[in-house]
Amino acid sequence: MKNSVNDSAIKKLKLLITVVDKAKGEFDADLIRAKAVARYQFGIPAADALFRGEIQLITSKKTGKIRNVISDGEHVLSMRAGDGLYTLRMEGAKRIVEAVPAPHMRVVVMDDSVPFVSEGRNAFAQFVLDCDPEIRLMDEVIVTDKNDNPIATGRAFLVPFEIKQMKKGMAVKVRSGKSDDE
């Protein structure tokens, strides 16, 4: 008797393994791993937006592990050494906002806080208008203005319920703002 769960897992694995490095004509295990982590962390549509075009993986000279993902010459992701997940760069945030409808991965802030957050300052709960209900504590998020323009990237320090209920406290620890990339 066949196990349908195993058959399903094998089909998904075969789809993932179809990633081929066209220049070499062979499998690129690092690229497969990089895409798999992005799909797990951000979801399939967002990962596809991040990995479109020509991909260059920057690896550590010492360990050989993936450190940065460059897509069409733009730095879109950096991999954290501690847990093997990605930190999102502003170019990556722009690609996700273009490809995936709101509210996916987004925290929307009031106009009053846009100048501060875009400079790299943290986003506080009292200035948040809305957020993705699927955000988990410490997830990578995109901070946007009310017109869905990305202004910063960072990590969620509160869950959606807390963000909407609290009058004080840091909602997003901002890593980089829009003005950092200009």
Language-model features: where?
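Helix-rich terminal scaffold detector
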Residues: M1-E26
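Substrate/ligand-engaging "lid" and interaction regions
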Residues: Q56-K61
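Charged, low-complexity, helix-prone segments enriched in Lys/Glu/Asp/Gln
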Residues: D30-A36
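Beta-strand/loop-dominated core regions that host nucleotide or nucleotide-derived cofactor-binding catalytic loops
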Residues: K14, A23, A36-I55, S71-D130, ...
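Low-complexity, intrinsically disordered regions enriched in charged/polar residues
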Residues: N3-I10, L31, M90, D111
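Terminal interaction modules at protein C-ends
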Residues: K65-I66
